Amino acid sequence: MSTTLVVDTSVVFGALDAGDPDHASCSETVSAGAALVLPAPVVVELDWIARSRGTLDATSALVNGLLDGSMLVVNLELEDYARAIELVEKYADLPLDLVDASVIAIAERLEQDTIATLDRRHFSVVRPSHIDAFTLVP
């Protein structure tokens, strides 16, 4: 695994919510020692999911993880938004949403080959600009 790991919402939520069916594998993934990078839209989506499921503890745990430095939020730059929209339009049949596209755009900008996600349906189809395909974990 690379020393930096771009993380999608599904893995963060799975790791933070002990009741999630993928909690063990997600926890192992985020505890493996890589620097965890969260694109900023992931933070907002995580809060929305936590609130919709009535598990606000996940939001609190996320914020505490940001405050203690165990996770780093990366803001999107203009070129990331441009790339994300390009991906949303190209993969409209999936459909690929802006949050997932932003995860891909950040991984491309940081030249990362691995993404932590449970969303195989979207991330296994998209072809990144810098490599043939992403390695998906867990």
What are these regions (language model features)?
Residues S10-V11, P41, E79, R121:
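Alpha-helix/helix-capping structural signal
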Residues L72-L118:
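Active-site neighborhoods of divalent-metal-dependent phosphate/nucleic-acid chemistry enzymes
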Residues V11, E45-L46, R83:
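A general alpha-helix detector
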Residues S2-T4, I104, E108-P138:
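Acidic, PIN/NYN-like endoribonuclease modules and their adjacent C-terminal/linker elements
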Residues M1-L38, R51-N64, S129-H130:
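Short, well-structured N-terminal submotif of metal-dependent ribonuclease cores
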Residues W48-R51, E108:
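Short glycine/serine- and small hydrophobic-enriched flexible loop segments
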Residues D8, E45, D100, D119:
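Acidic active-site catalytic centers that drive phospho-/nucleotidyl reactions
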Residues F13, V44, S124:
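Nucleotide phosphate-binding site architecture
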